[in-house]
Amino acid sequence: MAVLTHGSPTPSGAYFDGKGINFTLFSAHAEQVTLCLFDEQGQERQIAMPARTGDIWHGYLPGGKPGQRYGYRVSGPFDPSRGHRFNPHKLLIDPRARALEGKVGDDPRFTGGVSQPDVRDSAAALPKCLVIHEEYDWQGDKPPAIPWGNTVVYEAHVRGLTQLHPDIPPELRGTYAALAHPALIEHLKTLGITTLELLPVQFHIDEPRLQKMGLSNYWGYNVLAPFAVDPDYASGREGISPLRELRDAVKALHNAGIEVILDVVFNHSAELDVFGPTLCQRGIDNASYYWLTPDGEYDNITGCGNALRLSHPYVTQWVIDCLNYWRDSCHVDGFRFDLGTVLGRTPAFDQHAPLFAALAADERLSACKLIAEPWDIGLGGYQLGNFPTGFSEWNDQYRDAMRGFWLRGEVPRGTFAQHFAASSRLFEQRGRLPSASINQITAHDGFTLLDLLCFNQKHNQMNGEENRDGSDNNHSNNFGCEGLVADAAIWQRRKACQRALLTTLLLSQGTPMLLAGDEQGHSQQGNNNAYCQNNILTWLDWGSADRALMTFTADLIRLRQQIPALTQDQWWQSGDSNVQWLDSQGQALSDAAWEQGCQQQLQILLSQRWLVLINATDHECEMHLPEGEWEGIPPFGVSDHAERLTTWRGSAHTICVLIKRD
C-alpha cells in the first residue's frame, strides 16, 4: 500500500527525482489536502498529504514513477460569502500538472454547488493529471534572437494553418508536427516571417454551452491546465508525446531562423462563473486564486466568468514558474498575454504590479519577447501605451486608424501619419521604443483582411448566438455589395485596398503582425468571431490561395527589411534622415496642411531613398515627385505606376513605393 513521507515543499508540482515523486499543492485556506492516485483501471487510492510548510502541502511517494495518474481532493469551509468553496466530493486538477489524460465533458458532476456543496463525486468524469519526466535532445538549439526592428509576427492557429495543406501528409495535418514540415516552413521563409505567434497550445476545454450546441472552443482560450501541452494538436504517433512533438516543431522552426511565441491565458480559468464546473482552483483555494467582490462573488473583469488574482504572491509565482517552464522545456522565444490588463491589476491597473515586477526581475523571462493585449472589460481596463518597459502591445488604435483612412475616408492624414510612425504619441512620450507598437490590420479576433473588404455587417449565425456575438464596430467597407460575389469593378477596388492595407502594415514603423491567411485572401464568410468554428470556415484553403497576393506580401516584407528607418527601432525626429512628410506636390507638409480636414493624399520619404505614395481617395490623382530620379521596385513596377520620373498617377485606393536612383 502506498505511503507518503513528508517530502519537501519544493520543487513545486509533481516532480520525479529518479527514486520517487514529490507532490506539492498550494492552499492557504484548506483544512486538509488528499492526494488521489489512480491505476490504469481508474481505481482510486486516497492518501492525506502528511506535511504542510507555510501554505504548501506536500508529500513524497517512494517508488513513484512517471506515468502516475493523480488528482487532489481539498477539504475546508464552504462559505461563499467569504470566498470559500471547498468540496472534497470534487476531484481537482493540479494547477501545475504538466500533462492530463482524458477530456472534460458536459457533466453535471462537475457542479460544485452555488449556495451549498454538491455531493456528487466527480472523479470518474475528470481527466487525470500525469506525472511526466521526458528528456529531450535539443541538438544545440539556439534562439534566433531576431531584433525587434526586424521582427515580422505571423499570428496563426496550429490546426487552421496546416489542416488543409496539400503538401503535408494527411496524418500530420492540423498538428504540431505539421509546423515542423518543410512545406510549412518554406512558406514562412518565402514570406519573410521572422516570428510565428501561435494561438493557445495550453490544455484547454470546451465550455458546456458550446458542447450542448455541438461546437468547440477552437481558439483555445478556455485554459484548464496552463503547464500542459494540449494533446488535441498532437498527431498521436506511437512513442511521440504531445510535448515532444511541440519541441520538435520549435527546434525545426529555430533551425529555419523562425522564432516561436505562445499566446498564453492567465486572465481567467476554465471554471467560468459560479455556475461553472469545479475543476481546479475553485476547489483548491478560491479566495486566493480569484478576484472576488466583498460578498464573495466573482469579479468578472474578463467577460469569461472569473478573473485570476495575479497580484497574490503565490499566484504571481505560479505564472512566473509556468512561463519559465515553457521557456525551458520548449525553448519558446516569447509570450503574448491575452487580456493583459489583468496582469497588472491590484485590483486597479498598476505598472508596478507584482507580476510586472517579477517578470522584470527574472533574467530569462525579461529577455523574451513579451506582448500584451492591453485591455480587459473591467473599470480602467483600457491601458494601451501604459504597460511597463519590456512589453510590446497590440495597437487597436493603429488598426482602426488605418481601416478608417483607407476604407471609410474618415481619418485625416495627420492621424494616419501619427500611427504610421508607430503611434508615437502613445509610446514615445512614455520612454518606449517604436517596436512597442504591435501594428495590425486584422487578428484572429475579427474580420479577416478579405472579409474587411467584402462585408459591412458581421455574419456570425453559425456561432449559435443569433448573430449577437462579435463586434459591430469593424470600420469595414464592402464597396457596394455585401459578400464575396460582386462585379469586376467592385473587386478591382477591393483588391486595390487589400494591397494598400498590406503595404501600409508592412511599411509602417513599429512591429507588424500579419494574420495567417491574409496573404492568401482567406475568408471566413463574414464571421468576425469564429472562436467556435473548428472547420473549413477557419482552416486556410491552400488550394485556392491567391498566389499573386502571396508574392506581393513577400516582396513587401523583403522591402521592409531594406529600409533603415523601419528596422533600426529608433524614433523618427523632425528634420532627420529617417522620414519626410510631403504633399501631392512633393513639398514638405506645413502645419496648416496637416490640419486640412480628411486629406487622403500623402507622400512619405523614408531613409532619403524610398518614396511611399498614397492615394486613399476614391478617384485617380496625380502627384509630383520630389527632386530626383525615381523608379518602381517590387512589388511595384514602373510600367504600372510611373508615367515618367517626375510624376505618378495613382488610381483610387492605391499605394506605391518608388526608389531613388543612385
UniProtKB/Swiss-Prot annotation:
Involved pathway(s): Glycan degradation; glycogen degradation
Marked site (Transition state stabilizer) residue numbers: 445
Catalytic residue list: 338, 373
SUPFAM superfamilies according to UniProt: (Trans)glycosidases, E set domains, Glycosyl hydrolase domain
UniProt keyword annotations, A-Z: Carbohydrate metabolism, Glycogen metabolism, Glycosidase, Hydrolase
EC number: 3.2.1.196
Stretches of the chain forming a coiled coil according to its record: none
UniProt-listed Pfam families: CBM_48, GlgX_C
Reactions this protein catalyses: Hydrolysis of (1->6)-alpha-D-glucosidic linkages to branches with degrees of polymerization of three or four glucose residues in limit dextrin
Gene3D superfamilies listed in its UniProt record: Glycosidases (3.20.20.80), Golgi alpha-mannosidase II (2.60.40.1180), Immunoglobulins (2.60.40.10)
A GO biological-process term: glycogen catabolic process
Enzyme superclass (EC): hydrolase
Recorded family membership: Belongs to the glycosyl hydrolase 13 family.
HAMAP family: GlgX
Database matches in NCBIfam families: glgX_debranch, PRK03705.1
Function text: Removes maltotriose and maltotetraose chains that are attached by 1,6-alpha-linkage to the limit dextrin main chain, generating a debranched limit dextrin.
Record protein name field: Glycogen debranching enzyme
Source species taxonomy: Bacteria, Pseudomonadati, Pseudomonadota, Gammaproteobacteria, Enterobacterales
Recorded name of the encoding gene: glgX
